[in-house]
């Protein structure tokens, strides 16, 4: 279990959020329903999806590094 109030927990949450929104961008129904707004509270989902799709290599390497950290070091 990862605590959200610690730095590593916040990083895990942010990475999972970005990866989930990038996945939502690939699914047509979810894209039209969730990622249609670009401003406001719902715009956070759109911005996370853009980060996940444009920086997919950096995000995937970060996910692998964070998984290694959580499983073996922490």
UniProtKB/Swiss-Prot annotation:
Primary subcellular site in the record, as a coarse category: Golgi
Entry-linked InterPro entries: Kish-B, Ksh1
Cytoplasmic side: 74
Gene that encodes the chain: tmem167b
Subcellular location: Golgi apparatus membrane
PANTHER family linked: PROTEIN KISH-B (PTHR46815:SF1)
Leader sequence residues: 1-22
Transmembrane segments: 53-73
Function summary: Involved in the early part of the secretory pathway.
Bilayer topology annotation: Single-pass type I membrane protein
Keywords for this protein: Golgi apparatus, Membrane, Signal, Transmembrane, Transmembrane helix
Protein name in the entry: Protein kish-B
Chain ranges on the Extracellular side, renumbered to this chain: 23-52
Family: Belongs to the KISH family.
Keyword Ubl conjugation: no
Superkingdom of the source species: Eukaryota
A cellular component annotation (GO) from this entry: Golgi membrane
Keyword Coiled coil among UniProt keywords: no
């Amino acid at each position: 279990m990862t605590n959200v109030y610690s730095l590593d927990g916040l990083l895990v949450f942010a990475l999972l959020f970005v990866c989930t929104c990038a996945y939502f961008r690939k699914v047509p129904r979810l894209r039209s329903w969730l990622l249609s707004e670009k401003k406001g509270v719902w715009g956070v989902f759109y911005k996370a999806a853009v980060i996940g799709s444009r920086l997919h290599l950096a995000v995937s390497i970060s996910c692998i590094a964070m998984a290694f950290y959580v499983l073996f070091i922490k």
